[in-house]
Amino acid sequence: SDYANAVIPFLAFLDNDTSFAVADNRLVIYGGGQRPKSVADVLLNEEIQSVFYNSTHIGLVFLDTTGTGKYRLDVYNTSGQVETSLFFDMDYKDIILQNENIIIYNETQCLLANMSGVERFNGDFETPYLLFSPIRGNRYLAVSQESIDTIEMR
């Protein structure tokens, strides 16, 4: 078998017909309902730090080895191609892939970028937020210990 020596710690469905598996050395994307077939098999030679996904994209975080940032987020489409690579230094709490947006945040910092990797915002929160989530358009829900705020990005 192709996966004889692979450990596959992560498996998820993007939609009814598309799923993916992340092994220690590869990303495999499957298509088809009843009998899924491998549509992409991407070999990876770096250790994956974490995995994020939505219905159309898969994000893999690696430690950056180029010195550009602490981390590198590679965002793959369902064909297994890297659509963008985003370098960042923030120790992230969560990464959200939503529509054409990438949101990387922790309690005190946030980075917003589009799927082309263009940063739209990179800054600090005045209030520590426990949760930061997109609502619609340029509006976001920010939940702190004291309040629930709506933030609008320009």
Predicted regions and their residues:
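Surface-exposed loop/turn elements that mediate protein-protein interactions on large endomembrane-trafficking
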Residues: S1-A4, A23-N45, G67-F88, T108-E126, ...
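Repeated scaffold domains used in trafficking and secretory/extracellular systems
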Residues: D2-N16, V42-T56, F87-E100, E126-R139
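Beta-strand C-termini and the immediately following turn/loop, strongest in propeller blades
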Residues: L14-R26, N54-R72, I103-Q109, A142-S147
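Residues in flexible loops and secondary-structure boundaries
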Residues: S19, K37-S38, V61, E83, ...
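Short, surface-exposed, charge-dense and proline/glycine-enriched linear segments
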Residues: N99, S116-F121, N138-S144
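Hydrophobic, glycine-enriched assembly/anchoring segments
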Residues: L131-R154
